[in-house]
Regions:
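Sec-dependent bacterial lipoprotein signal peptides
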Residues: 1-23
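Acidic, metal/ion-coordinating pockets
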Residues: 3-5, 25-26, 33-368
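Intrinsic disorder/low-structure terminal segments
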Residues: 17-20, 29-30, 39
Length: 368
């Protein structure tokens, strides 16, 4: 339970991370939605009978997403001063939802060896996980191009810190199975599966950083077949399947060809929500058939807060089973490394600007 709202009491049932981890808003406008089509040969999750033979009782739940998080520069100072307040005022927004997720773009280590030749390498102490939990984050993804910045030693430290913290982290593992395995939880009667993977890796590190067989590392979306297999598997016994991706081109306002190619494949395989980031700026969000896609969440807790890269916010989805009932955007601006929610006219203008980003995505304001 976090320091802001005891919403964890609404989170029922098993909270099962991969074996690696053990047990583990306010906003603007909204769009209305639909029911998604199940994979051929499978029952929709909503039709799965309960053990007693009666229909399961599901109520809508909310999940909030923030963008890229690290703890370098001024953020390390905040973290060292007090992990429980390190994310600043945005914690209240995250804590209002039943679930909250961010992209943890750093290795969790104080040791390791920096990736050779890499211009930017990020690492943070284990208190970074404390900070996320205190801010209301329920699950994070480390599948990104900084998750193994401190190579194998940093990976081992990261996995150990995750186990101790009991904060579920997807997209990373001590072997391939754990890296691709979803985090599972049940909220308001909905069985939720969250998978993390990265489509962005420096060419010279793809082999070393990708989890394969018994080798630890990150879940890579470059192995599309493997990722789609995991989505299909999750679809069979989940009411909502969420895929969190690191993808896109830095500072490019529209989704690139690789994103536009992968998103429909994930929806077809059974994903209900696909959310990602990497570009350091916001990209458009909306419906792709009956699924929901957000192509870019931008920076979130980040030391770079220029005019474009400092625009951020929290995306909150209201979901029941496979239906995304509503999307809401709580805009913020990064000040001193942390997101500060906007109010009044600035908020309304920021929401309108966020909606306008959909223009070059091929996504829709409504499902279907």
């Amino acid at each position: 339970m976090n320091a802001y709202i005891p919403r964890r009491l609404a989170l029922i049932g098993t909270v099962t991370a991969s074996a690696l981890f053990g047990v583990a808003c306010t906003a603007a406008e909204s769009s209305a939605p639909p029911a998604a089509t199940p994979d051929v040969g499978e029952k929709p999750a909503e039709e799965t009978a309960s053990p007693a033979g009666s229909a399961p009782v599901r109520r809508p739940y909310t999940i909030s997403f923030g963008g890229d998080v690290h703890f370098e520069g001024v953020l390390r100072t905040r973290l060292n001063a007090d992990p429980k307040t390190a994310l600043g005022p945005i914690a209240k927004v995250l804590s209002r939802s039943d679930l909250a997720m961010v992209n943890l773009e750093t290795a969790i280590t104080t040791g390791g060896t920096p990736a050779p030749g890499k211009q930017f390498t990020f690492r943070a102490p284990a208190t970074a996980l404390t900070a996320l939990k205190a801010a209301g984050v329920d699950v994070a993804s480390m599948a990104n191009n900084h998750g193994m910045d401190y190579m194998e030693g940093g990976l081992a430290d990261s996995l150990a810190a995750i186990r101790r913290s009991r904060l579920p982290v997807v997209g990373v593992g001590r072997n391939e199975a754990q890296a691709y395995r979803p985090w599972r939880t049940t909220v308001n009667g909905n069985r939720v599966a969250v998978i993390g993977a990265t489509q962005v890796l420096d060419a010279e590190f793809i082999q070393a950083w990708t989890a394969a067989g018994d080798k630890g590392g990150l879940a890579s979306a470059k192995n599309e077949a493997r990722l789609l297999q995991e989505v299909r598997r999750a679809r069979r016994n989940s009411d909502t399947v969420i895929v969190h991706l690191h993808w896109g081109t830095e500072l490019q306002k529209c989704p690139n060809e690789a994103q536009r190619s992968l998103a429909p494949k994930l929806i077809q395989a059974g994903a209900d929500v696909v959310v990602g980031g990497h570009a350091h700026i916001l990209l458009g969000s909306g419906y792709l058939k009956n699924g929901y896609v957000s192509y870019g969440m931008g920076n979130f807790v980040f030391y770079n807060w220029g005019p474009e890269t400092g625009r951020t916010g929290v995306l909150t989805l209201t979901i029941k089973g496979r239906e995304v009932l509503k999307d809401q955007w709580t805009p913020a601006v990064i000040q001193g490394g942390v997101p500060v929610p906007l109010a009044g006219t600035a908020r309304r203008q920021a929401v309108a600007g966020w909606r306008a980003l959909r223009g070059c995505t091929g996504l829709s304001a409504t499902p279907g």
